[in-house]
């Protein structure tokens, strides 16, 4: 979450003025469309809820209040997605995930040969396909997205009292799903934002490289993730 924040901030700081303004304009268009589409009682020009002192270290110079609000909304969304994107991992991480995929593939192979499936095989197949959208999604990512929706719909909903805060919550939930699913909305490709968390050099890898080395007993100099995140640039 912290590294994703720095990568997002520095990517915009290092971008040329035209690229940054065009990028934020595209993001503002997305927010305005969602507000209108879902009839949310919030305004992009007056979002005091996101004027959070805890986020000052991640602020960037902007030309308007609306542009600052746009940046902060997406910063918060990216932080939530980064925090929760791996929450769907099963015990022993990818190993169990690969094993379950092999079980599913064997059941599908058996089904294609028109062989009868036992009750357990049929139940496993149906559950797996329901969670992974007919095996189109990676298991831990699909589980994570479902958990994110539950978090927004139940846990966070109960923590907020003011009605306008709940409206913001609906907005961030929608943006989070757009990022996780790498959807294209209002002409903007959300894969661009997902790349901060899931790409060749991303916040996730920078984080777990240091943690895995420490956990495995390999004591050496950690990678300089601050220097690396400072090199991020939006093009």
Residue ranges and their predicted role:
Residues 2-80, 88-235:
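Sequence-structural signature of the catalytic-core scaffold of metal-dependent phosphohydrolases
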């Amino acid at each position: 979450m912290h590294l994703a924040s720095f990568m997002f901030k520095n990517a915009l700081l290092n971008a040329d003025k035209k690229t940054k303004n065009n990028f934020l304009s595209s993001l503002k268009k997305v927010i305005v469309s969602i507000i209108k589409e879902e009839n949310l009682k919030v305004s992009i020009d007056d979002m005091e809820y996101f004027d959070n002192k805890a986020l000052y270290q991640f602020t960037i110079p902007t030309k308007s209040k609306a542009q600052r609000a746009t940046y902060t909304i997406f910063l918060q969304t990216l932080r939530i997605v980064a925090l929760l994107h791996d929450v769907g991992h099963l015990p022993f991480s990818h190993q169990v995930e690969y094993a379950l995929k092999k079980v599913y593939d064997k059941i599908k192979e058996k089904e294609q040969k028109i062989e009868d499936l036992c009750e357990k095989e049929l139940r496993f197949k149906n559950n797996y396909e329901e969670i992974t959208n007919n095996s189109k999604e990676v298991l831990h990512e699909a589980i994570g997205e479902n958990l994110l929706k539950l978090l927004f719909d139940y846990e966070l909903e109960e923590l907020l009292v003011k009605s306008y805060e709940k409206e913001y919550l609906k907005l961030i939930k929608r943006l989070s799903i757009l990022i996780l699913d790498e959807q294209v909305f209002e002409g903007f490709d959300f894969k661009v934002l997902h790349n901060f968390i899931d790409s060749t050099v991303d916040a996730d890898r920078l984080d777990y490289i240091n943690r895995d080395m420490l956990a495995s007993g390999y004591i050496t100099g950690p990678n300089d993730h601050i220097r690396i995140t400072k090199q991020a640039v939006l093009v």
